[in-house]
Swiss-Prot record:
Pfam families: GATA, PAS_3, PAS_9. Coiled coil: none annotated. It comes from Neurospora crassa (strain ATCC 24698 / 74-OR23-1A / CBS 708.71 / DSM 1257 / FGSC 987). Residues 21-57, 335-348, 849-861, 986-995, 1036-1047, 1104-1128 have a biased composition (Low complexity). It comes from the Eukaryota. Residues 469-508, 650-691 form the PAC domain. A zinc finger (GATA-type) spans 934-959. This is White collar 1 protein. The gene is wc-1.
Amino acid sequence: MNNNYYGSPLSPEELQHQMHQHQQQQQQQQQQQQQQQQQQQQQQQQQQQQHQHQQQQKTNQHRNAGMMNTPPTTNQGNSTIHASDVTMSGGSDSLDEIIQQNLDEMHRRRSVPQPYGGQTRRLSMFDYANPNDGFSDYQLDNMSGNYGDMTGGMGMSGHSSPYAGQNIMAMSDHSGGYSHMSPNVMGNMMTYPNLNMYHSPPIENPYSSAGLDTIRTDFSMDMNMDSGSVSAASVHPTPGLNKQDDEMMTMEQGFGGGDDANASHQAQQNMGGLTPAMTPAMTPAMTPGVSNFAQGMATPVSQDAASTPATTFQSPSLSATTQTIRIGPPPPPSVTNAPTPAPFTSTPSGGGASQTKSIYSKSGFDMLRALWYVASRKDPKLKLGAVDMSCAFVVCDVTLNDCPIIYVSDNFQNLTGYSRHEIVGRNCRFLQAPDGNVEAGTKREFVENNAVYTLKKTIAEGQEIQQSLINYRKGGKPFLNLLTMIPIPWDTEEIRYFIGFQIDLVECPDAIIGQEGNGPMQVNYTHSDIGQYIWTPPTQKQLEPADGQTLGVDDVSTLLQQCNSKGVASDWHKQSWDKMLLENADDVVHVLSLKGLFLYLSPACKKVLEYDASDLVGTSLSSICHPSDIVPVTRELKEAQQHTPVNIVFRIRRKNSGYTWFESHGTLFNEQGKGRKCIILVGRKRPVFALHRKDLELNGGIGDSEIWTKVSTSGMFLFVSSNVRSLLDLLPENLQGTSMQDLMRKESRAEFGRTIEKARKGKIASCKHEVQNKRGQVLQAYTTFYPGDGGEGQRPTFLLAQTKLLKASSRTLAPATVTVKNMSPGGVPLSPMKGIQTDSDSNTLMGGMSKSGSSDSTGAMVSARSSAGPGQDAALDADNIFDELKTTRCTSWQYELRQMEKVNRMLAEELAQLLSNKKKRKRRKGGGNMVRDCANCHTRNTPEWRRGPSGNRDLCNSCGLRWAKQTGRVSPRTSSRGGNGDSMSKKSNSPSHSSPLHREVGNDSPSTTTATKNSPSLRGSSTTAPGTITTDSGPAVASSASGTGSTTIATSANSAASTVNALGPPATGPSGGSPAQHLPPHLQGTHLNAQAMQRVHQHKQHQQHQQQHQQQHQQQHQQQHQQLQQHQFNPPQSQPLLEGGSGFRGSGMEMTSIREEMGEHQQGLSV
């Protein structure tokens, strides 16, 4: 036997099988022993008769010697005396009693196996008269000790020969073999290390481990109770005993090595000199039928009666090493309260964790240990029935991400049709769909969703569960699976693995053993023979060498293995490599002549175009090209030049599936020396834009202030519309190839990632996020993703993104004193103008395709995939906005593009004419006698009108410069028209002409304040007056009266919208109310602080006091205006729809003249 063998625990099935064999062997041995006993009994009877005969002869001799002088008697008297002598000598005992006495003596003598010398051993211990009897002095009295004084002088001469017996310790019940032996004798018997029977002091191993045979893995101890044998993985050799009896132990006593080896152990068999520290300590009783061995024969054994059937061994010879082995067989099915066994832990002398090498397991997973944990788990709620390696089961690791499968049985592969390589590493949910693709967290379509949820919830709680549900084999064939999930620990007390047992209840209806009420079913998961389910894929005609496929799979694999990028390849390898790429490419590599004839097609033609290469070679491209695309395609081929790329997009007719968009990209090749020219192209199917009109209208339609982009499914820009220049001040070509997340802040990227994940699945998804323009300003945006090339619910190859810039009031800015709830008019998006498109929009709709017929690599109406989705044709036939891209349209896309450009140009001209007519009507209607004056100093002559606190040009040049310096915004501007500067306002960089966000962020402080002193002008006013009011939409002016005198501020109608002096007409009459009720519309609903509210109230009282003075000077102003009107031009018109403007009632000027505003306001304000 091999002394270095490290065995592993056997499965319960194997243990039961071995135990059954051992029992059969024991029965055979018992029969042999009975035969031997019968022979021995016969010999004993003969010896008994001889002994009686000898005693009779001796008695007769003594009698004859004492009766020499006595007269002889009759033969009858002699016969009577002989009979009495026989009776006195025990001749009256029956044969059964004699046999029982011999058996008892034999059991008592052999309770402690030991070698004997060569002298004759008499089977009867009552042969006291024999002088050669070595047991004549055997003491039958009760023992007074435990042989503590026994020394090495105990006679054990001779050699012990090895016995080849079975490694089974079969001990019977205590009442069977020791019925006639005193209990005191049994209690004081000398303990042997391998006899786990009764209380005994510890004893050290008297044998050295060197030279001893190791105990085999099937070594077990049978206590004849209710459990089977146990395997033990011995780490060190263990000598055994091999003397066999009916009800005695059976151990191997062969030390191996012959007489020399036995002689070397003879000196170690002395039982004396044992110290208490080396004696084994054993617990009161053994848990039924379990005893494990490791380290050596005499290792101390300790076992707790209340613990699991596992034994801990520790070798006394290894002082610095502690090894704990806890293994044991599972309890019988009737035992349900056995605790889960502790894991196997081993610490070698080096201190590190030992790693057991997997010699026999290819997967490296200890399945026997896992099944043992299943059988010996704590408080089992499900009865599995019989389990062996023929079951279909998998093992999942719950500590890894998504609980992947780490082990799969052979019958599970046969049951599902999937191979081991297709199963390991995946979650078990792949069986819940016919195609094997099921995403986590999604609603199940082919399986009962509630059953799956219950299964998931129970597994998350770490509980056992039995669930029947529909699963699908490879290829989509369903079967009714009865699934049982059992959690088991491993190295710690926590749950590590889940073992799932499966069985097809339709094919194996007899597997259900029984069911207790409405509880779980007891199932026999074992299979006698299960046929392998083999999935047969749809038959497809394989490419033959005639189609150009000359390299087989083995050749391609060899080339890939021999590929070395650093080394120098030979010409043969280069040619083979090029040939491999050509024949295995997904794209159709084709060669065309200048006239459009096919000269070569790669084998991918069969997959993409459904034609065999031989069917198209020699034919013209026009035979499979759409009739409307023949002219532009032929023109592109004839105009091809060397070193110039050729890119043609046209509709090609497939053999069975109709027309599809096809793009070919290549160049002209000129063969040197022969003058032959051809065009080498690489073509692939290209899905085009497909967007339903109803989907677009449900999400807000098309507006002006929005950006349309084509993005990949990962969020990378493939094409950007041209209006990104005016909205974000960025160039489209700089954005192409970058990610949309680069324009966002980190806070918005997480939500954006979740939204694009939904869009990747074919759903229309929207999210609100933030974008940054070129200056780094943060703008609020709202992006909606549409499936680019198919309907909703189908996985697209690219996405269409509609990004709308939101209103200024929703932007994130620094806090101000007054928070305006109402949205600023400048941030309201314009109403969409349906049917109006510009030239840039037309290029956007066509995906950036150039007018000459070619397209950009990132902006063409192409995607990153090689084939369109299953719904491409259906999406194009539906209510598609891109109706011009239908494959069945009778015109070419170049013609449609030219027509669209023409229509857009006509619409733009018509729009310009309408706007011009609107300006003329406003100018004719607004012709009045009002003359513009400065809102601060009231001057009417100035070289340029500048912007003031209201955002309008209501300040003269000097006052406007002071205001700009005070607020830190100096706008250098030259005027080409004296007195009127509004003509340059459209191209101005003034904060009022920029976006409201620019005006707000441009402020150095959270609020912009303006103070007015007692003087009628703003000269020298550099401090901030108390009572300042600030809004998110722009600065405001606060005025205060301090000291003596009065402050007079005469404002025109242009400044009445944002200054406090023009907050509204005085409340005259019973409907008067709080000052907040008379705020202009753009300040309605605002929250003013207490100081500002008090200042407004004081201002209204001041207005009522000065109303009388205003009425007196009103006539004088009118006369002066009439006189000046004859010498000056009409005041310039305000810019229509001024972005961010805050004119009267919070709106822009909207091409309304100053006189109209004055007419609505009825009167100016002066103090």
